[in-house]
Swiss-Prot record:
Residue ranges of the TM segments: none
Residues spanned by motif 'KMSKS' region: 279-283
Entry keyword Protein biosynthesis: yes
Subcellular location: Cytoplasm
Name of the protein this chain belongs to: Cysteine--tRNA ligase
Cellular component, GO, one term: cytosol
Family as reported in the entry's similarity comment: Belongs to the class-I aminoacyl-tRNA synthetase family.
Domain of life: Bacteria
EC number: 6.1.1.16
Pfam families: CysS_C, tRNA-synt_1e
Keywords, alphabetical: Aminoacyl-tRNA synthetase, ATP-binding, Cytoplasm, Ligase, Metal-binding, Nucleotide-binding, Protein biosynthesis, Zinc
Assembly description: Monomer.
């Protein structure tokens, strides 16, 4: 496996980069907030999936593949899902309509992230499979004075927790309710948030001590992370936008329910994603899904391979904002085209790549180090290093008949070039390009004659 580097990670909780010390090196545990399955995942959703996939790969390399548990949830109960189900399937009973939306969206999400080269997490819990665990935590919070029932809701009392706001570093009097949390008169404090709310007859619901209802957003992750990772685990990840209120409220629920000093030891957050220099939004007309990029020509007039999208993300440090642009994708594609297709075999990753990733996932330095390895004779080490980043170029299988046809056209192009028929030579090159073939012209070092090699564009 090679030398084990000291892993250093930036912790949002402490605002410091420090050495990572797992609770149990035999079972390193990481939780990352996954998708709410009401719509196809957009390019901003892709960033945490890719970032924490690289961390998952690194942890597996350092501690062993069987000694890392990565949980990434599926949020399949949410008012946005209900609204989408009613819009898209008005003729179906609500539960069937919700299932149609969530199953379709979840299937698409899995297909998208697979094309981005992401490993499957160790476990992928769904919120609807963990309702009993949520109810248990809520009962604990009511029992120890951290939650109360009002107007058909169970709410967390933010003033009952002395250090509420520690993650976001926002004083309580400055905290607003935030996304998905309504400010109502029945709350003791404006920042109190919903743990459980009653459901009407046409809304999904589960029986509870407080009546038929459904969970609030934040309690879902507290329940799922505890079930699969324990009261305290090593790393909790997600996007910068989740620090407040979602992660702040997860911490409050979990710590107050279980009497712990922390929920997770390290909190990691990736930066925002812009598209062509502007905030991505449907109103701006620049809302781009992963599916759009992979399978349509809506961005830059062409489809983009998953490995290009992934590398484009990794060319910016995960904590920095990223401007997702056609220029960036083209740059990533040019870089990939220079890299060999190879197999790692028993080779170990190069220390330069490993050290870069061990320094708070410095993928920028890791990509630069990987590019320096793309030299003749380095194929196995290059491949082992590329696997850590999940950017090993794919080897394309070509059938003999197709290869023979390409060889014939390449030979014909060489003949017309000798005759100085450059128009016809360009036509052949363009024809091959349309078939996904990239030509490379050079000279025979002994004869000085023009030679042309070809490869399938990646």
């Amino acid at each position: 496996m090679g030398r084990t580097p000291e892993l250093k990670l930036y912790n949002t909780l402490t605002r410091e980069k420090s050495a990572f010390k797992p609770i149990d090196a035999e079972n390193v545990r990481m939780y990352v907030c996954g998708p709410t399955v009401y719509d196809f995942a957009h390019i901003g959703n892709a960033r945490p999936v890719i970032v924490f996939d690289v961390l998952f790969r690194l942890l597996r390399h350092v501690y062993g593949e069987d000694h890392v548990t990565y949980a990434r949830n599926i949020t399949d109960v949410d008012d946005k899902i209900n609204a989408r189900a009613l819009r898209d399937h008005p003729g179906l009973p609500l539960n069937e309509a919700i299932r149609a939306v969530t199953e379709k969206t979840e299937t698409q999400f899995h297909a998208d992230v697979a094309e981005l080269g992401c490993l499957e997490p160790s476990v992928e819990p769904r919120a609807t499979d963990n309702i009993a665990e949520m109810i248990q935590i809520i009962e604990k919070l009511i029992g120890n004075g951290h939650a109360y029932v009002a107007a058909g809701e169970v709410l967390f009392d933010t003033k009952s927790m002395a250090d509420y706001g520690e993650l976001s570093k926002r004083p309580l009097d400055e905290q607003q309710a935030g996304a998905r949390v309504a400010v109502d008169a029945h709350k003791k404090n404006p920042g109190d948030f919903v743990l459980w709310k009653l459901s009407s007859h046409n809304e999904p619901g589960w029986e509870s001590p407080w009546g038929r209802g459904r969970p609030g957003w934040h309690i879902e992750c507290s329940a799922m992370s505890r079930r699969y990772l324990g009261d305290i685990f090593d790393i909790h990840g997600g996007g910068l936008d989740l620090i407040f209120p979602h992660h702040e409220n997860e911490i409050a629920q979990s710590r107050c329910a279980h009497g712990t000093e922390v929920m997770a030891n390290v909190w990691m957050h990736n930066g925002f994603v812009q598209v062509e220099g502007r905030k991505m939004s449907k109103s701006e007309g620049n809302f781009v899904t992963i599916h759009d990029l992979l399978h349509t020509e809506t961005f830059g007039g062409r489809k983009w391979p998953g490995e290009v999208l992934r590398l484009a993300m990794l060319m910016t440090h995960y904590r920095e904002p990223i401007d997702f642009s056609i220029k960036r994708l083209e740059e990533a594609e040019r870089l990939l085209a220079k890299w060999p297709t190879a197999e790692a075999g028993d080779a170990a990753p190069d220390e330069s790549v490993l050290n870069a990733l061990a320094d708070d996932l410095n993928t920028v330095a890791a990509v630069q180090a990987l590019h320096a390895l793309a030299q003749p004779g380095n194929d196995a080490v290059f491949a082992a290093s590329a696997v850590l980043l999940g950017v090993l170029p794919k080897k394309v299988e070509i059938d003999e008949a197709f290869a023979a046809a390409v060889d014939a056209l390449v030979a014909m192009r060489l003949e017309v070039l000798k005759a100085k028929n450059f128009v016809e030579a360009d036509r052949i090159r363009d024809e091959l390009g349309a078939k996904g073939i990239q030509l490379k012209d050079g000279k025979d070092p002994e004869t000085g004659e023009r030679v042309t090699t070809w490869e399938v564009k990646r």
